[in-house]
Amino acid sequence: MSLMSLPRISLLALFLGAGSFVYGAYIPLKAWAAQILLDMAWERRLQGAADSRPWPWADTAPLARIRQPRLGIDQVVLEGSSGRVLAFGPGHVGGSARPGSAGNVVISGHRDTHFRWLQRLQNGDELLLQTDDGRDRSYRVVQSAIHHESEIGLLEPLQGDQLRLLTCYPFDAVSAGGAQRYVVTAYPAGA
């Protein structure tokens, strides 16, 4: 090996290392940057903007905001729960009650980004769900459970109101798409 090829090999190794870092950080960085744009879109929605999409080509828009005071969580909830939507934030599951209305509100998110904090929730913790009229609805966590995806009747009619937060499980799984789901159930505070 000549002395001239050593700098080239070093440069190639540097580029490969940088590429590996960028590839590994892509999803967390995208999730972080999207939250800034989503916060601005949420403010536009609260002000009554007709189009509150976070960027012009977005196929979703902010629908609500979820906060958990003890953990310092504050996230915009998007309309829909497709993979493209969930790449940017938690999403409202179609067919469930809309945030702020009576019924079973279901919100899903990825276990390794936006809903990683679900594993730290405790029974009795408060969840605040803000709707686009600016009102906060307070819920208390009553249960966290692990279910197989086939046994979750998330959209079944229920007696009373509740909020369910849903993510894949286990939180530290190496590969995505497992059959287990982590479900947090919360009832309106004072109920």
Residue ranges of model-derived segments:
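Solvent-exposed, non-transmembrane regions of membrane-associated and secreted proteins
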Residues: 7-191
